[in-house]
């Protein structure tokens, strides 16, 4: 099943999700409407809400609560992006100016806060203490991940284990929430809930690993942001760490300096050459494929359906993309 088939299968549900997102963004405060609509209409893969609606359908559930789950997960993600771009001082996302570049840092932070709190209002509508607890824990872990990544910036001593922990906190945990909350709403068994939770964790990890590879291998137009941003921001991601640890003394020193100083986009060609020599992008991509396969294996216990097949295909497609 290709992405077009998955989109066709989920079109009606995702249309409801998009309508819900726009409705829940509505506020009497004009700036919230302007900035909120700016960011949600800027595109994006909507993969987290897609996971939620597919997971619910895979367990035979098709009620409004699945749409609410999908919406609150996307709101947490959107709020984190607003805050991320301020912290990273990013000026381009999804092929256009970031919200902070367009509206300023203060507005981005405050509207991000509004969207976070709106997500909690949506969870309250579900009347599930378990989902509330899962969401509260996830947002706390996400915040910890943001702080840990901030600490890792310009630090070439960052370990691969530390990097993977940040990936889990910042990305995979929210994928987990999308799949697990859908399973709870659908009334799935404990085994099915755990299976979907694992699916989300592995898929989220694979997804972020591929994003980190694409930062060095995609073109800016396809990627929707500047290539080499991670290097320019001094972020030690897996491809960079692998190249540094496998390069000779001179190569390791060059990468170490690039991480420590940041802002050295002019070093990108040399870094890419070192990565190519040591197959660092291949290494990171292989790790991503392993995680995607774990995601597929995790949901084999789900009943056979076109929605289960869509989840399986989504895992494979997440590591076979150029944006």
Regions found by a protein language model. Give the residues of each.
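All-alpha prenyltransferase/terpene-synthase fold signal
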Residues: 1-323
């Amino acid at each position: 099943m290709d992405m077009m088939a998955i989109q066709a299968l989920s079109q009606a549900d995702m249309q409801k999700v998009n309508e819900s997102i726009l409705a829940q963004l509505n506020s009497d405060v004009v700036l919230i409407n302007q900035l909120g609509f700016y960011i949600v209409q800027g595109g994006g893969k909507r993969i987290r809400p897609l996971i939620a609606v597919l997971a619910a359908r895979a367990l035979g559930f098709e009620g409004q609560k699945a749409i609410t789950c999908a919406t609150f997960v996307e709101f947490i993600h959107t709020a984190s992006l607003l805050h991320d771009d301020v912290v990273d001082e990013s000026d381009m996302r999804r092929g256009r100016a970031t919200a902070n570049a367009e509206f300023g840092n203060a507005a981005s932070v405050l509207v991000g806060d509004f969207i976070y709190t709106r997500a909690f209002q949506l969870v309250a509508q579900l009347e599930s203490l378990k989902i509330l607890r899962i969401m509260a824990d996830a947002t706390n872990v996400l915040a910890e991940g943001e702080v840990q990544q901030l600490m890792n910036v310009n630090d070439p001593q960052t370990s691969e284990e530390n990097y993977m922990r940040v990936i889990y906190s910042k990305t995979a945990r929210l994928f987990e929430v999308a799949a697990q909350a859908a399973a709870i709403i659908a009334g799935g068994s404990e085994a099915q809930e755990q299976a979907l939770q694992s699916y989300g964790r592995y898929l989220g990890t694979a997804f972020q690993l591929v994003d980190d590879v694409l930062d060095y291998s995609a073109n800016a137009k396809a990627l929707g942001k500047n290539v080499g941003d991670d290097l320019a921001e001094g972020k030690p991601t897996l491809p960079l760490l692998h190249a540094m640890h496998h390069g000779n003394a001179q190569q390791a020193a060059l990468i170490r300096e690039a991480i420590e100083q940041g802002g050295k986009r002019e070093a990108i060609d040399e870094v890419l050459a070192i990565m190519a020599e040591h197959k660092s992008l291949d290494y990171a991509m292989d790790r991503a494929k392993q995680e995607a396969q774990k995601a597929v294996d995790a949901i084999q216990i789900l009943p056979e359906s076109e929605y289960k097949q869509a989840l399986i295909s989504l895992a494979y497609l997440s590591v076979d993309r150029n944006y």
